[in-house]
Amino acid sequence: CLMFDREYFEQGPMTGKSLYTNYRWMPELTIPLCHHLVTECPIRIDDTILDFGCAKGYIVHALRLLGYEAYGVDISEYAISQAPKEVNGYVQLIEPYAELPGKYTWIIAKDILEHIPYDHIDEQLSILHDATDDIIVMVPLGDGTKYHIDAYEKDITHHIREPLEWWSDRFKHAGFGIDIETHDLGPFKSNWQGIHPEGNGLILAYKNEKTFA
């Protein structure tokens, strides 16, 4: 996808495309993030994980350093080409709205689904539903017109600006059950919580008839 190019990841503010500058491996941030992911969900050591919209594969890299079987997909040819050599064979380029390359215990969709146009979101959620047992989603929220956090408007690839209840309804429509839906992202978005208490949402959802232990 040409929109998610070098300028988007490396010179976002300068080019007016995104908030990203020099998008790089930062283990001091990504490894603790992944530790929180696997402990809060909880994700078991023998689970398989797909990072949907993995960009350069840093979450995949961190999860694998922690001993988890993690994979990633992204639509950005540039981002996948920049992935660290440690995740070669574990991350891959896909086409938008393509069937995912496997079946997974968990899918992580962190700051991804807001990039999907409204007329494709149900299709995309159905694709995710077909490929996983459980999913964890983090998404910026809005009032249907604008985001609660102004900075999120600076990414020109953002489409969906809806409240948490809207997202929850879309997941239910796709066949998921909702285990958790909350504005409190705890350790995942602590830097944004003080800006607006409903600026981000977290959803834990499941396909099978089960609850999280």
Annotate each PLM feature.
Residues 68, 133, 176:
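Short phosphate-binding/catalytic loops that engage adenosine nucleotides
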Residues 164-175:
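Phosphate/nucleotide-binding beta-alpha loop and adjacent structural elements of enzyme active sites
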